[in-house]
């Protein structure tokens, strides 16, 4: 019998092959947790990148991975029944604001049906704390900055945002009815090594290195609260051992809190491009384009709530974070893509 495995706290991380999920799983194993990770390894972007993230976790005997879809209620039910999880961090979701306009069903299946399966899993198999990913997109076209958790979130401007808003509503109902302790984290534009290829920083670096033109929407007059991955992981790790208590006053008995997790320092896209140019030592070709459907002008997180609860203090400035991403892209990601291209050429030869 493996005594160490039996005494370690067990955590389920959904979306473990994703950008945030893989970083979190690695951090949790190093902190002494027994981590079970699941992911459906879909083709929203290259599964090769997702597999490479998982490969970096394989050296830990305290990480187990299962390829499965959170929308599969039968498999999810068995997973929770057999897992004995102390805590759950739910990060699996169909991401992307613009992709949701053309592929709405993917968002319903993953972000709504999948989240319901997670809620049912913890209802039937109680755990100490369910932490789930919400999004800054729930603030919609809110023009009052910085965004605070008390601001209205009743007017989402994308299908993705609507699904994340629904997650918060379902979480409240389940916590109110069943006493499930939950924390929803509204992520603000996460970036860094092993990031998603559909995100702006990834696209901009790739375009500049390839000599392609960057599209800057709304004439480049958009700003985002870019948050480095290490700061995000630090925030999750800090909140994980702090399940909320039932409200002692008011109309809701839910053991639920919703918190922003961001950098608290928005960056305009024009400035972002300059920072990337400096990190690459190359100049970008830029095309100024109109506002995109479903986009918002700014995101800007107040992190006072998370700071008061955990001491959270995002530490990585945009210049340092971009430099780290560029180094990873040149060293690791380009090698990964070269391997993929070689394998493709070999298969058709």
Ranges and model annotations:
Residues 145-146, 197-205:
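A glycine/serine/threonine-rich, flexible loop-to-helix segment
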Residues 194:
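Conserved GTPase G-domain signal focused on the G5
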Residues 159, 167, 197, 269, ...:
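Conserved donor sugar-nucleotide recognition element shared by glycan-biosynthetic enzymes
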Residues 108-111, 160, 205, 262, ...:
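Amphipathic, non-transmembrane alpha-helical scaffold segments
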Residues 1-190, 236, 240, 312, ...:
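N-terminal Rossmann-like NAD(P)+-binding domain of SDR-like oxidoreductases, especially those catalyzing
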Residues 24, 30, 208-349:
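C-terminal substrate-binding subdomain of Rossmann-fold SDR/epimerase-dehydratase oxidoreductases
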Residues 166, 170, 174, 204, ...:
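Hydrophobic alpha-helix immediately C-terminal to the catalytic Tyr-X-X-X-Lys motif of short-chain
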């Amino acid at each position: 019998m493996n005594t160490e495995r039996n005494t370690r706290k067990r955590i389920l991380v959904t979306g473990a092959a994703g950008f945030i999920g893989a970083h979190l799983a690695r951090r949790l194993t190093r902190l002494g947790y027994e981590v079970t990770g699941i992911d459906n390894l879909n083709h929203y972007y290259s599964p090769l990148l997702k597999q490479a993230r998982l490969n970096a976790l394989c050296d830990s005997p305290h990480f187990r991975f299962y390829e499965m879809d959170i929308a599969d209620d039968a498999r999810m039910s068995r997973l929770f029944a057999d897992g004995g999880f102390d805590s759950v961090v739910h990060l699996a979701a169909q991401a992307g604001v613009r992709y949701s306009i053309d592929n709405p069903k993917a968002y319903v299946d993953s972000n709504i049906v999948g989240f319901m399966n997670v809620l049912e899993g913890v209802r039937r198999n109680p755990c100490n704390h369910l932490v789930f990913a919400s999004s800054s997109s729930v603030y919609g076209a809110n023009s009052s900055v910085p965004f605070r958790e008390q601001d209205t979130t009743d007017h989402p401007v994308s299908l993705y945002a609507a699904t994340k808003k629904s997650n918060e509503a379902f979480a409240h109902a389940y916590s109110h009815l069943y006493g499930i302790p939950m924390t929803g984290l509204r992520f603000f534009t996460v970036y860094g090594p092993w990031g998603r290829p559909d995100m702006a920083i990834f696209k901009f670096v790739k375009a500049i290195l390839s000599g392609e033109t960057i599209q800057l929407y709304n004439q480049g007059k958009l700003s985002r609260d870019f948050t480095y991955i290490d700061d995000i992981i630090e925030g999750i790790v800090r909140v994980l051992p702090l399940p909320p208590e039932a409200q002692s006053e008011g109309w809701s008995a839910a053991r639920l809190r919703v918190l922003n997790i961001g950098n608290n320092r928005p960056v305009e896209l024009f400035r972002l491009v300059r920072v990337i140019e400096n990190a690459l030592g190359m100049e970008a070709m830029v095309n100024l384009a109109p506002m995109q459907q479903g986009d918002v002008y700014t995101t800007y997180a107040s992190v006072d709530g998370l700071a008061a609860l955990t001491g959270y203090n995002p530490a990585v400035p945009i210049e340092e974070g971009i430099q780290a991403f560029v180094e990873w892209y040149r060293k690791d990601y380009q090698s990964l893509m070269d391997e993929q291209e070689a394998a493709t050429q070999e298969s058709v030869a």
